[in-house]
Design a protein with these regions (language model features):
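ATP-dependent NMP and nucleoside kinases share a basic, alpha-helical "lid"
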Residues: 1-15
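PAPS-dependent sulfotransferases, especially Golgi type II membrane carbohydrate sulfotransferases
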Residues: 5, 22-74, 78-155
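Sensor-1/coupling segment of RecA-like P-loop NTPase cores
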Residues: 18-19
């Protein structure tokens, strides 16, 4: 459908360690529940989110090959985090777009003014906070790590 509506679009498929995605999402949702519930339902979060992410990623692995190589690319989180401007350049090149000096300067200004960790970092612990062993979860998602060059982040 996307290609029918936007035939000249370039699709960038992003990839990240699903264990890191799950711990981040569950932590954010648990914090949100603390605002409007008497009790955070940790068990429900721990049961639902790994299943949901697995379903989504299995579909991603199955359907990624349907996107034409000429108008799609994969972007890993670790590549983006290592050098965000290099990833922007790759995306522009894949899309056949010119990355103007002005656009580059404005993006670099934003990056410089919003450094990662500026406001601290969330400390995650899947085992202690949610009773989930990251190694078990990582093995569950082996199919995804095998399909895409994703680096493990979560410990």
């Amino acid at each position: 459908v996307l290609q029918a509506v936007f035939p000249d679009a370039t699709v960038v498929v992003t990839h990240r360690d699903p264990v890191a995605v799950i711990q981040s999402a569950m932590t954010m949702l648990a914090y949100g529940q603390r605002l409007n519930r008497h009790r955070v339902d940790i068990k429900s979060l721990a049961e639902y989110w790994p299943d949901r992410i697995e379903h989504l990623l299995r579909r991603c692995v199955e359907t990624r090959k349907l996107l034409p190589e000429s108008s799609s690319m994969d972007s890993t989180f670790h590549e983006f985090m290592a050098d965000d401007m290099a990833m922007v350049e790759k995306i522009y090149a894949k899309a056949g777009l010119e990355l103007t000096k002005q656009a580059r300067a404005e993006m670099q200004q934003f990056i410089d003014e919003h450094p990662r960790g500026k406001h601290g970092q969330v400390q995650y612990n899947l085992k202690e906070d949610f009773g989930i062993d990251p190694a078990v979860l990582r093995e569950r998602f082996r199919f995804y790590f095998d399909a895409f060059p994703v680096k493990a982040e979560a410990k």
